[in-house]
Amino acid sequence: MHDSFSDAATPVVSAFYDRFPYPGDPLQDGPPPGYNWRWCLRSVEAAVHGQVRPKENGQRPSRLLDAGCGTGVSTDYLCHLNPGAEVLAVDISAGALEVARERLRRSGGAGQVASLRQEQRSLLDLAGEGPFDYINSVGVLHHLRDPLAGLQALAGLLADDGLLHLFLYADGGRWEIHRCQRALELLAVGNGAEGLRLGRELFEVLPETNRLRRHHAQRWALDTVAEANFADMYLHPQETSYNLTGLMALIEAAGLHFAGFSNPSVWDPARLLEGELLERARSLAPREQWALVEELDPDISHFEFFVSRQPVHPESWTEDSRLLEAAGEVQPCLW
């Protein structure tokens, strides 16, 4: 691994993921299950811009970066859903990368792309590797001591017309997780095997009527069956979460532009309101609508979204002449 630990938390976070390679998804032989459009560049372009760039003969391969790839789940999809691309996947954990390499070997992902590099490196130490057409960094920046420095580093690797997909923790929907994290920290259980044992025991000994126990059973029990997933949720040594205002401030501080949520239906007030209340909500500016949803839905535990270096102006297709000139393309998710 490159020895430049650019973030103060890198050594402890790397050691944590060596103990608990994350995510704990099982390996499979053959392509990954289902279809995740967020990891298909052409689907992402269609969602963000309302159109895709025409394919041209001799066009260079798309360049993709999986920044903080963990055990390779996202890398696997990126390879299978972007055939012919050049893919660089990096992570600070040797243990997680060992699993990732085996995952891609078994799935045949490397054979789908022009090139695949899986390297033990920090996303802060990739100067000279860009530009990338698409950067995927899911669940990574909030584990840096300085998330802004991480976002600025990724911004510097992004092509002028590229897109960056991020997943960051949302403060409001993680209240029960935060309480459990603080309780386990007060109990000094650590973030190793003992912490895992005592963390699971906590949810067994709390009264059945306890809200923390009930919320864990209702929301997180299935997600944390794998040991690595439980540890990542409750024992992580470095974590930051955001509200909507703080998220937008982070994006702007990095010199980037918000380009839309990758789960837009979650942020639609119609999911929560109707009648006159919905009409009033619809009259608000988009950010105010999102702020309203944030206040009304205390279960939103993360933000998933796209950012760009330049402002995005999606094609609305309201002009008949533009629509008649367009050529259709079969959505890749139909395979």
Language-model-derived ranges and their functions:
Residues 63-65, 75-124:
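Class I SAM-dependent methyltransferase SAM/SAH-binding core
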Residues 133-146:
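A short SAM/SAH-binding and catalytic strip from SAM-dependent methyltransferases
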Residues 214-335:
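Rossmann-like AdoMet/SAM-dependent catalytic core
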